[in-house]
Protein backbone atom coordinates (compact mmCIF):
# COMPACT_ATOMS: atom_id res chain seq x y z
CA UNK A 1 0.00 0.00 0.00
CA UNK A 2 1.32 3.43 -0.94
CA UNK A 3 1.05 6.38 1.46
CA UNK A 4 1.56 9.87 0.06
CA UNK A 5 2.37 12.77 2.37
CA UNK A 6 2.39 16.32 1.03
CA UNK A 7 4.95 18.85 2.19
CA UNK A 8 3.20 22.16 1.50
CA UNK A 9 5.57 25.12 1.24
CA UNK A 10 5.31 28.64 -0.17
CA UNK A 11 8.39 28.06 -2.35
CA UNK A 12 8.13 24.46 -3.53
CA UNK A 13 5.70 21.79 -2.39
CA UNK A 14 6.46 18.12 -2.96
CA UNK A 15 5.35 14.60 -2.17
CA UNK A 16 6.78 11.93 0.08
CA UNK A 17 5.76 8.55 -1.31
CA UNK A 18 6.03 5.60 1.10
CA UNK A 19 5.63 2.44 -0.96
CA UNK A 20 7.04 -1.08 -0.51
CA UNK A 21 9.05 -2.44 -3.45
CA UNK A 22 8.99 0.97 -5.15
CA UNK A 23 12.69 1.43 -5.87
CA UNK A 24 12.36 -0.06 -9.33
CA UNK A 25 9.67 2.55 -10.07
CA UNK A 26 11.89 5.57 -9.40
CA UNK A 27 12.31 6.33 -13.10
CA UNK A 28 8.57 6.36 -13.63
CA UNK A 29 8.10 8.58 -10.55
CA UNK A 30 10.65 11.12 -11.79
CA UNK A 31 9.33 11.09 -15.35
CA UNK A 32 6.16 12.74 -14.10
CA UNK A 33 8.07 15.68 -12.58
CA UNK A 34 9.13 17.21 -15.93
CA UNK A 35 12.84 17.25 -15.08
CA UNK A 36 15.78 17.54 -17.47
CA UNK A 37 17.19 14.32 -18.91
CA UNK A 38 20.52 14.30 -17.06
CA UNK A 39 20.69 12.59 -13.67
CA UNK A 40 23.61 12.13 -11.29
CA UNK A 41 22.93 9.30 -8.83
CA UNK A 42 24.99 9.70 -5.65
CA UNK A 43 25.41 6.82 -3.21
CA UNK A 44 28.04 4.98 -1.17
CA UNK A 45 29.64 1.66 -2.16
CA UNK A 46 27.58 -0.50 0.22
CA UNK A 47 24.21 0.99 -0.73
CA UNK A 48 25.06 1.06 -4.42
CA UNK A 49 25.97 -2.63 -4.32
CA UNK A 50 22.50 -3.45 -2.93
CA UNK A 51 20.29 -1.01 -4.83
CA UNK A 52 22.30 0.93 -7.42
CA UNK A 53 21.57 -1.25 -10.44
CA UNK A 54 17.82 -1.33 -9.76
CA UNK A 55 17.71 2.47 -9.49
CA UNK A 56 19.92 3.13 -12.54
CA UNK A 57 18.02 0.62 -14.70
CA UNK A 58 14.70 2.20 -13.73
CA UNK A 59 15.94 5.73 -14.49
CA UNK A 60 17.41 4.71 -17.84
CA UNK A 61 14.24 2.84 -18.80
CA UNK A 62 12.35 6.10 -18.19
CA UNK A 63 14.63 7.91 -20.65
CA UNK A 64 17.11 9.58 -18.29
CA UNK A 65 20.84 9.83 -19.01
CA UNK A 66 22.35 8.53 -15.78
CA UNK A 67 25.82 8.97 -14.29
CA UNK A 68 26.55 7.53 -10.85
CA UNK A 69 29.16 8.29 -8.22
CA UNK A 70 29.91 6.70 -4.84
CA UNK A 71 31.24 8.71 -1.92
CA UNK A 72 32.88 6.96 1.05
CA UNK A 73 30.49 5.95 3.83
CA UNK A 74 30.55 7.74 7.16
CA UNK A 75 30.03 11.08 8.88
CA UNK A 76 33.73 11.90 8.80
CA UNK A 77 33.55 12.16 5.00
CA UNK A 78 30.79 14.77 5.18
CA UNK A 79 33.17 17.55 4.17
CA UNK A 80 33.74 20.20 1.52
CA UNK A 81 36.33 17.87 -0.04
CA UNK A 82 33.56 15.38 -0.81
CA UNK A 83 31.41 18.17 -2.25
CA UNK A 84 34.29 19.19 -4.51
CA UNK A 85 34.31 15.65 -5.92
CA UNK A 86 30.60 15.93 -6.70
CA UNK A 87 31.20 19.26 -8.44
CA UNK A 88 33.90 17.61 -10.57
CA UNK A 89 31.53 14.80 -11.58
CA UNK A 90 28.76 17.32 -12.31
CA UNK A 91 31.16 19.23 -14.56
CA UNK A 92 32.36 16.08 -16.34
CA UNK A 93 28.76 15.11 -17.07
CA UNK A 94 27.72 18.65 -18.00
CA UNK A 95 24.86 18.85 -15.53
CA UNK A 96 22.54 21.74 -16.39
CA UNK A 97 20.07 23.73 -14.32
CA UNK A 98 17.30 21.34 -15.37
CA UNK A 99 19.39 18.32 -14.30
CA UNK A 100 18.81 16.31 -11.14
CA UNK A 101 20.96 14.81 -8.42
CA UNK A 102 19.43 11.72 -6.82
CA UNK A 103 20.59 10.86 -3.30
CA UNK A 104 20.44 7.10 -2.76
CA UNK A 105 21.61 6.45 0.78
CA UNK A 106 21.42 7.54 4.39
CA UNK A 107 21.59 10.94 6.02
CA UNK A 108 25.20 11.67 5.08
CA UNK A 109 24.60 10.98 1.38
CA UNK A 110 21.34 12.94 1.46
CA UNK A 111 22.88 15.97 3.16
CA UNK A 112 25.88 16.10 0.83
CA UNK A 113 23.92 15.49 -2.36
CA UNK A 114 21.41 18.13 -1.34
CA UNK A 115 24.15 20.66 -0.63
CA UNK A 116 25.91 19.93 -3.93
CA UNK A 117 22.58 20.36 -5.75
CA UNK A 118 21.84 23.58 -3.86
CA UNK A 119 25.13 25.14 -4.89
CA UNK A 120 25.82 23.72 -8.37
CA UNK A 121 24.79 26.37 -10.92
CA UNK A 122 23.12 28.17 -7.98
CA UNK A 123 20.69 25.30 -7.55
CA UNK A 124 19.56 22.24 -9.51
CA UNK A 125 16.94 19.59 -8.74
CA UNK A 126 17.48 17.04 -6.01
CA UNK A 127 15.47 13.89 -5.29
CA UNK A 128 15.89 12.02 -2.01
CA UNK A 129 15.73 8.21 -1.91
CA UNK A 130 16.61 7.43 1.72
CA UNK A 131 17.82 3.94 2.61
CA UNK A 132 18.18 4.24 6.41
CA UNK A 133 15.43 4.69 8.97
CA UNK A 134 16.98 7.94 10.17
CA UNK A 135 17.03 9.41 6.68
CA UNK A 136 13.49 8.19 5.92
CA UNK A 137 11.91 9.84 8.93
CA UNK A 138 14.11 12.90 9.24
CA UNK A 139 17.00 14.09 7.11
CA UNK A 140 15.52 13.38 3.65
CA UNK A 141 12.55 15.66 4.42
CA UNK A 142 12.61 19.41 4.84
CA UNK A 143 15.44 20.67 2.66
CA UNK A 144 18.24 20.99 5.19
CA UNK A 145 21.52 20.23 3.45
CA UNK A 146 25.12 20.65 4.50
CA UNK A 147 28.51 19.42 5.55
CA UNK A 148 30.54 19.49 8.74
CA UNK A 149 33.32 21.87 9.74
CA UNK A 150 36.18 20.55 11.91
CA UNK A 151 34.74 22.62 14.77
CA UNK A 152 31.08 21.67 14.43
CA UNK A 153 28.39 19.63 12.73
CA UNK A 154 26.45 21.05 9.77
CA UNK A 155 27.94 24.52 10.14
CA UNK A 156 28.17 24.82 6.34
CA UNK A 157 24.88 24.34 4.53
CA UNK A 158 21.80 25.62 2.73
CA UNK A 159 18.06 25.08 2.59
CA UNK A 160 17.22 23.29 -0.66
CA UNK A 161 13.95 21.39 -0.87
CA UNK A 162 13.80 18.11 -2.81
CA UNK A 163 11.47 17.74 -5.77
CA UNK A 164 10.37 14.34 -4.48
CA UNK A 165 11.09 11.85 -1.68
CA UNK A 166 10.72 8.11 -2.34
CA UNK A 167 10.69 5.77 0.65
CA UNK A 168 10.78 2.02 0.05
CA UNK A 169 10.44 0.36 3.49
CA UNK A 170 11.74 -2.95 2.12
CA UNK A 171 15.27 -1.58 1.86
CA UNK A 172 15.36 -1.51 5.67
CA UNK A 173 15.77 -5.30 5.62
CA UNK A 174 19.41 -4.81 4.63
CA UNK A 175 20.04 -2.12 7.27
CA UNK A 176 22.54 -3.06 10.01
CA UNK A 177 20.95 -3.32 13.46
CA UNK A 178 22.98 -0.43 14.85
CA UNK A 179 21.80 1.86 12.03
CA UNK A 180 18.18 0.84 12.64
CA UNK A 181 18.50 1.69 16.33
CA UNK A 182 20.04 5.05 15.48
CA UNK A 183 16.99 5.85 13.35
CA UNK A 184 14.66 4.95 16.21
CA UNK A 185 16.08 7.90 18.16
CA UNK A 186 14.50 10.31 15.68
CA UNK A 187 11.21 8.38 15.81
CA UNK A 188 11.12 8.65 19.62
CA UNK A 189 11.92 12.35 19.23
CA UNK A 190 8.72 12.90 17.22
CA UNK A 191 6.74 11.18 19.95
CA UNK A 192 8.18 13.52 22.58
CA UNK A 193 7.93 16.79 20.65
CA UNK A 194 4.78 16.39 18.53
CA UNK A 195 2.86 13.12 18.50
CA UNK A 196 1.83 11.65 21.86
CA UNK A 197 -0.12 8.89 20.09
CA UNK A 198 3.06 7.72 18.33
CA UNK A 199 4.83 7.76 21.71
CA UNK A 200 2.08 5.57 23.18
CA UNK A 201 2.29 3.13 20.26
CA UNK A 202 6.05 2.82 20.75
CA UNK A 203 5.54 2.13 24.45
CA UNK A 204 3.17 -0.74 23.65
CA UNK A 205 5.75 -2.57 21.53
CA UNK A 206 7.77 -5.14 23.47
CA UNK A 207 10.93 -4.40 21.49
CA UNK A 208 12.14 -1.52 19.33
CA UNK A 209 15.76 -2.51 18.83
CA UNK A 210 15.41 -4.61 15.65
CA UNK A 211 13.13 -4.45 12.63
CA UNK A 212 12.17 -8.13 12.89
CA UNK A 213 10.60 -7.62 16.32
CA UNK A 214 8.37 -4.74 15.21
CA UNK A 215 4.91 -5.57 13.90
CA UNK A 216 4.29 -4.42 10.30
CA UNK A 217 1.40 -2.17 11.35
CA UNK A 218 3.63 -0.41 13.89
CA UNK A 219 6.38 -0.02 11.28
CA UNK A 220 3.83 1.58 8.95
CA UNK A 221 2.82 3.96 11.75
CA UNK A 222 6.46 4.75 12.53
CA UNK A 223 7.13 5.81 8.95
CA UNK A 224 3.88 7.60 8.17
CA UNK A 225 3.45 9.40 11.50
CA UNK A 226 7.12 10.44 11.65
CA UNK A 227 7.10 11.75 8.07
CA UNK A 228 3.78 13.51 8.69
CA UNK A 229 5.17 15.15 11.83
CA UNK A 230 8.21 16.42 9.94
CA UNK A 231 6.02 17.61 7.04
CA UNK A 232 3.65 19.42 9.42
CA UNK A 233 6.46 21.26 11.20
CA UNK A 234 8.37 22.16 8.02
CA UNK A 235 5.14 23.26 6.34
CA UNK A 236 4.58 25.78 9.13
CA UNK A 237 8.22 26.95 9.32
CA UNK A 238 10.39 26.10 6.32
CA UNK A 239 13.60 27.86 7.36
CA UNK A 240 13.64 27.51 11.13
CA UNK A 241 12.31 30.95 11.97
CA UNK A 242 10.54 29.57 15.02
CA UNK A 243 8.58 26.31 15.26
CA UNK A 244 11.03 24.21 13.23
CA UNK A 245 13.60 24.60 16.00
CA UNK A 246 11.69 21.96 17.97
CA UNK A 247 13.03 19.34 15.54
CA UNK A 248 16.41 19.92 17.18
CA UNK A 249 15.28 18.27 20.42
CA UNK A 250 18.18 16.17 21.68
CA UNK A 251 20.48 17.58 19.00
CA UNK A 252 22.03 20.39 21.07
CA UNK A 253 24.03 18.16 23.42
CA UNK A 254 24.00 15.42 20.76
CA UNK A 255 25.88 17.49 18.18
CA UNK A 256 28.44 18.59 20.79
CA UNK A 257 29.09 14.96 21.76
CA UNK A 258 29.47 13.97 18.09
CA UNK A 259 31.91 16.81 17.46
CA UNK A 260 34.05 16.02 20.52
CA UNK A 261 34.31 12.36 19.51
CA UNK A 262 35.27 13.33 15.93
CA UNK A 263 32.13 11.65 14.49
CA UNK A 264 33.83 8.26 14.94
CA UNK A 265 32.51 6.86 18.22
CA UNK A 266 28.74 7.33 17.96
CA UNK A 267 26.11 7.19 15.25
CA UNK A 268 24.12 10.41 14.91
CA UNK A 269 21.01 8.79 16.38
CA UNK A 270 22.98 7.43 19.34
CA UNK A 271 24.21 10.95 20.12
CA UNK A 272 20.66 12.29 19.77
CA UNK A 273 19.42 9.67 22.24
CA UNK A 274 22.01 10.84 24.77
CA UNK A 275 21.02 14.43 24.02
CA UNK A 276 17.34 13.67 24.66
CA UNK A 277 18.17 12.14 28.04
CA UNK A 278 20.15 15.28 28.92
CA UNK A 279 17.49 17.72 27.68
CA UNK A 280 14.74 15.78 29.42
CA UNK A 281 16.53 15.93 32.77
CA UNK A 282 17.30 19.63 32.34
CA UNK A 283 13.56 20.17 31.76
CA UNK A 284 12.77 18.23 34.95
CA UNK A 285 15.32 20.19 36.98
CA UNK A 286 13.84 23.47 35.71
CA UNK A 287 10.36 22.36 36.77
CA UNK A 288 9.06 22.18 33.20
CA UNK A 289 8.55 18.40 32.96
CA UNK A 290 7.55 15.56 35.25
CA UNK A 291 10.26 13.07 36.23
CA UNK A 292 7.83 10.24 35.44
CA UNK A 293 7.57 11.39 31.81
CA UNK A 294 11.34 11.76 31.53
CA UNK A 295 11.64 8.19 32.82
CA UNK A 296 9.14 7.02 30.17
CA UNK A 297 11.20 8.70 27.47
CA UNK A 298 14.44 7.18 28.75
CA UNK A 299 12.83 3.73 28.92
CA UNK A 300 11.92 4.01 25.22
CA UNK A 301 15.46 5.06 24.34
CA UNK A 302 16.81 2.02 26.21
CA UNK A 303 14.19 -0.23 24.58
CA UNK A 304 15.50 0.91 21.20
CA UNK A 305 18.97 -0.33 22.22
CA UNK A 306 20.40 3.19 22.39
CA UNK A 307 22.91 4.57 24.91
CA UNK A 308 21.64 6.86 27.67
CA UNK A 309 25.02 7.69 29.21
CA UNK A 310 27.90 9.83 27.97
CA UNK A 311 30.89 7.94 26.54
CA UNK A 312 33.46 7.25 29.25
CA UNK A 313 36.11 9.90 29.66
CA UNK A 314 34.32 12.61 27.69
CA UNK A 315 35.23 16.10 28.90
CA UNK A 316 32.08 17.78 30.21
CA UNK A 317 33.62 21.25 30.01
CA UNK A 318 34.48 20.46 26.40
CA UNK A 319 30.81 19.70 25.73
CA UNK A 320 29.72 22.98 27.32
CA UNK A 321 32.29 24.87 25.24
CA UNK A 322 31.19 23.09 22.05
CA UNK A 323 27.59 24.13 22.70
CA UNK A 324 28.60 27.73 21.99
CA UNK A 325 29.19 26.72 18.35
CA UNK A 326 25.68 25.28 18.01
CA UNK A 327 23.67 26.71 15.10
CA UNK A 328 20.83 27.59 17.49
CA UNK A 329 22.93 30.00 19.57
CA UNK A 330 21.32 33.44 19.54
CA UNK A 331 23.03 36.52 21.00
CA UNK A 332 25.54 34.22 22.69
CA UNK A 333 22.85 32.15 24.43
CA UNK A 334 22.32 28.45 23.75
CA UNK A 335 18.68 27.73 22.89
CA UNK A 336 17.41 24.41 24.22
CA UNK A 337 14.32 22.50 23.15
CA UNK A 338 12.76 21.16 26.36
CA UNK A 339 9.63 19.01 26.88
CA UNK A 340 6.72 20.20 29.00
CA UNK A 341 4.59 17.07 28.44
CA UNK A 342 4.64 14.10 26.07
CA UNK A 343 3.99 15.60 22.64
CA UNK A 344 4.69 19.22 23.65
CA UNK A 345 7.97 21.14 23.93
CA UNK A 346 9.15 24.70 24.42
CA UNK A 347 12.28 26.53 23.25
CA UNK A 348 14.22 28.47 25.88
CA UNK A 349 17.52 30.29 26.29
CA UNK A 350 17.26 30.18 30.09
CA UNK A 351 19.47 27.08 30.41
CA UNK A 352 22.78 28.02 32.03
CA UNK A 353 26.12 26.23 31.91
CA UNK A 354 25.50 25.17 35.52
CA UNK A 355 22.18 23.55 34.57
CA UNK A 356 23.91 21.62 31.79
CA UNK A 357 26.92 20.69 33.92
CA UNK A 358 24.72 19.37 36.74
CA UNK A 359 22.92 16.97 34.40
CA UNK A 360 25.97 15.84 32.42
CA UNK A 361 27.87 15.01 35.62
CA UNK A 362 25.12 12.49 36.42
CA UNK A 363 25.41 10.85 32.98
Swiss-Prot record:
Belongs to the sugar phosphate cyclases superfamily. Dehydroquinate synthase family. This is 3-dehydroquinate synthase. GO terms for cellular component: cytoplasm. It catalyses: 7-phospho-2-dehydro-3-deoxy-D-arabino-heptonate = 3-dehydroquinate + phosphate. It comes from Trichormus variabilis (strain ATCC 29413 / PCC 7937) (Anabaena variabilis). NAD(+) binds at residues 107-111, 131-132, 144, 153. Binds 1 divalent metal cation per subunit. Can use either Co(2+) or Zn(2+). The keyword NAD applies. InterPro entries: Dehydroquinate_synthase, DHQ_synth_AroB, DHQ_synth_fam, DHQS/DOIS_N, DHQS_C. Zn(2+) binds at residues 186, 251, 268. Pathway: Metabolic intermediate biosynthesis; chorismate biosynthesis; chorismate from D-erythrose 4-phosphate and phosphoenolpyruvate: step 2/7. One of its GO terms (biological process) is amino acid biosynthetic process. Its cofactor is Co(2+); Zn(2+); NAD(+). Gene3D superfamilies: 3.40.50.1970, Dehydroquinate synthase-like - alpha domain (1.20.1090.10). Its main location: cytoplasm. Keywords: Amino-acid biosynthesis, Aromatic amino acid biosynthesis, Cobalt, Cytoplasm, Lyase, Metal-binding, NAD, Nucleotide-binding, Zinc. Pfam families: DHQ_synthase, DHQS_C.
